[in-house]
Amino acid sequence: GSLKERIQTLDEKQKSLMQQQEDTLLELPNRPHDSVPSGQSEEDNEVVAEEGDKPDLGNSAKPHWDLADQYKLIDFEAGVKISGAGFPVYRGKGAKLQRALIQFFLDRADAAGYEEFIPPHVVNADSGRGTGQLPDKEGQMYHCTEDDLYLIPTAEVPLTNLYRGDLLKADDLPIQLCGYTPC
């Protein structure tokens, strides 16, 4: 073949090898920081801080679903009707409690020096790959194929991608961001 055909063949081979390399690299997990304790289950988690007095409720403690029903805070049946299992509808005081808790935690983060963001609820595939969501969780993420956008699982995905591709200086760290999304 001609030199042009040979170059074209080698270009295609290089693209294929580069894609194989990227696919392999995307399967490698991120290493946790050395300060992160190692464990096999949630029992191995380390409590970092506790606040306030914990009342001893003894046998009078009720599970959250009973409290939600008793005080009409969450309508599980409406959630099933609208979206299916696992999508509760917060109503009345339950909706107010949800909003108050969100505000409480955002205010705490702000007081600790975190910058608050309201990020988009969908991201492109590069953003999904940038946080390890893709390809690992591809089948578990809602995907709008028309726009090739993915529904985020947490605010972490878009917030982390604010710095995707940037070279950060050690003097600029840590970068403290927070955000709330209903995702």
Question: What annotation goes with each model-predicted range?
Answer:
Residues E51-C183:
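TRNA-recognition modules of translation machinery and tRNA-sensing kinases, especially anticodon-binding
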Residues G1-P55, L73, E77:
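N-terminal alpha-helical targeting/anchoring segments
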